């Protein structure tokens, strides 16, 4: 006798007869409630752009972080439950520092994503990593950086699946943004074009009017460290779109 759907819903480690893990599927749905984030990989570097939802005029916009630095050569954009993202971000930062201390070299973007996805998969285990949770993480991440292979962009979802992308959108308006990215992206795209395209797409999908306080923008270029755009720099870029 099969259990009812609601009983499969409650078990994070139980497959349904159709071979589905409902809790993981629900975690992926949680991403669709998050703010929109876009990552674009070019030969000149990677750009990450994220919408910041300012729900009250009394909120301090600078306190909302949607793009963070993992290491000098890697940045990460997030969408979904930000509290869940903090645990994964901490894991990524510890891994990059341990790698540096152990091997005296910077960690590749793929290796960082792999380390974080391993933690994302450990939900519900009794002897899991101390950072693991009793449920799947309700957050999707875009890791953008530069390593010996050049500029790299990786997308990771709550199932622990990660994949390299040329351009990727996550969050509430990801479907519309992804189809727009497919139209504008080309292999010879410059970083400047990528920045402009990502902001134009954000402008199209955001409910609020795009300005320097309700978006975040960061780039990572070969030979240069992770750079988060200041409010003044954002205003300059927004003028052009």
From Swiss-Prot:
<feature type="modified residue" description="Phosphoserine">
    <location>
        <position position="56"/>
    </location>
</feature>
<keyword id="KW-0539">Nucleus</keyword>
<dbReference type="InterPro" id="IPR001353">
    <property type="entry name" value="Proteasome_sua/b"/>
</dbReference>
<dbReference type="InterPro" id="IPR023332">
    <property type="entry name" value="Proteasome_alpha-type"/>
</dbReference>
<dbReference type="InterPro" id="IPR029055">
    <property type="entry name" value="Ntn_hydrolases_N"/>
</dbReference>
<keyword id="KW-0963">Cytoplasm</keyword>
<comment type="similarity">
    <text>Belongs to the peptidase T1A family.</text>
</comment>
<dbReference type="GO" id="GO:0005737">
    <property type="term" value="C:cytoplasm"/>
</dbReference>
<protein>
    <recommendedName>
        <fullName>Proteasome subunit alpha type-5</fullName>
    </recommendedName>
</protein>
<dbReference type="GO" id="GO:0005634">
    <property type="term" value="C:nucleus"/>
</dbReference>
<dbReference type="InterPro" id="IPR000426">
    <property type="entry name" value="Proteasome_asu_N"/>
</dbReference>
<dbReference type="GO" id="GO:0019773">
    <property type="term" value="C:proteasome core complex, alpha-subunit complex"/>
</dbReference>
<comment type="function">
    <text>Component of the 20S core proteasome complex involved in the proteolytic degradation of most intracellular proteins. This complex plays numerous essential roles within the cell by associating with different regulatory particles. Associated with two 19S regulatory particles, forms the 26S proteasome and thus participates in the ATP-dependent degradation of ubiquitinated proteins.</text>
</comment>
<dbReference type="GO" id="GO:0005576">
    <property type="term" value="C:extracellular region"/>
</dbReference>
<keyword id="KW-0597">Phosphoprotein</keyword>
<dbReference type="Pfam" id="PF10584">
    <property type="entry name" value="Proteasome_A_N"/>
</dbReference>
<dbReference type="GO" id="GO:0005654">
    <property type="term" value="C:nucleoplasm"/>
</dbReference>
<dbReference type="InterPro" id="IPR050115">
    <property type="entry name" value="Proteasome_alpha"/>
</dbReference>
<feature type="modified residue" description="Phosphoserine">
    <location>
        <position position="16"/>
    </location>
</feature>
<dbReference type="InterPro" id="IPR033812">
    <property type="entry name" value="Proteasome_alpha_type_5"/>
</dbReference>
<dbReference type="GO" id="GO:0005839">
    <property type="term" value="C:proteasome core complex"/>
</dbReference>
<dbReference type="GO" id="GO:1904813">
    <property type="term" value="C:ficolin-1-rich granule lumen"/>
</dbReference>
<comment type="subunit">
    <text>The 26S proteasome consists of a 20S proteasome core and two 19S regulatory subunits. The 20S proteasome core is a barrel-shaped complex made of 28 subunits that are arranged in four stacked rings. The two outer rings are each formed by seven alpha subunits, and the two inner rings are formed by seven beta subunits. The proteolytic activity is exerted by three beta-subunits PSMB5, PSMB6 and PSMB7. PSMA5 interacts directly with the PSMG1-PSMG2 heterodimer which promotes 20S proteasome assembly.</text>
</comment>
<keyword id="KW-0325">Glycoprotein</keyword>
<dbReference type="Pfam" id="PF00227">
    <property type="entry name" value="Proteasome"/>
</dbReference>
<keyword id="KW-0007">Acetylation</keyword>
<dbReference type="GO" id="GO:0043161">
    <property type="term" value="P:proteasome-mediated ubiquitin-dependent protein catabolic process"/>
</dbReference>
<feature type="modified residue" description="Phosphoserine">
    <location>
        <position position="63"/>
    </location>
</feature>
<dbReference type="GO" id="GO:0034774">
    <property type="term" value="C:secretory granule lumen"/>
</dbReference>
<keyword id="KW-0647">Proteasome</keyword>
<dbReference type="GO" id="GO:0070062">
    <property type="term" value="C:extracellular exosome"/>
</dbReference>
<dbReference type="GO" id="GO:0005829">
    <property type="term" value="C:cytosol"/>
</dbReference>
<feature type="modified residue" description="Phosphothreonine">
    <location>
        <position position="55"/>
    </location>
</feature>
<feature type="glycosylation site" description="O-linked (GlcNAc) serine">
    <location>
        <position position="198"/>
    </location>
</feature>
<feature type="modified residue" description="N-acetylmethionine">
    <location>
        <position position="1"/>
    </location>
</feature>
<dbReference type="GO" id="GO:0000502">
    <property type="term" value="C:proteasome complex"/>
</dbReference>
């Amino acid at each position: 006798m099969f259990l009812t759907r609601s009983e499969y819903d409650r078990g994070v480690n139980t497959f349904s007869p159709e071979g589905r893990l409902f809790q993981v599927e629900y975690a992926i749905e949680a991403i669709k409630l998050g703010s929109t984030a876009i990552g674009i990989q070019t030969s000149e570097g990677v750009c990450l752009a994220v919408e910041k939802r300012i729900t009250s005029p009394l909120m301090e916009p600078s306190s909302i972080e949607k793009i963070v630095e993992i290491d000098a050569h890697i940045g990460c954009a997030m969408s979904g439950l930000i509290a869940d993202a903090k645990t994964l971000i901490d894991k990524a930062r510890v891994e990059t520092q341990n790698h540096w201390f152990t091997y005296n070299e910077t960690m590749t973007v793929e290796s960082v994503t792999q380390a974080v996805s391993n933690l994302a998969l450990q939900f519900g285990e009794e002897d899991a990593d101390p950072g693991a949770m009793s449920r799947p993480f309700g957050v999707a991440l875009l890791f953008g950086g530069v390593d010996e292979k050049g500029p790299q962009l990786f997308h990771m979802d709550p199932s622990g699946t990660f994949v390299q992308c040329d351009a990727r959108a996550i969050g509430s308006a990801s479907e519309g943004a992804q189809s727009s990215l497919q139209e504008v992206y080309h292999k010879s795209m410059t970083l400047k074009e990528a920045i402009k395209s990502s902001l134009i797409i954000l402008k199209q999908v955001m409910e609020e009017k795009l300005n320097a306080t309700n978006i975040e923008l960061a780039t990572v270029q070969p030979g240069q460290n992770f750079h988060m755009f200041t409010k003044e720099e954002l205003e300059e870029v927004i003028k052009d779109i």
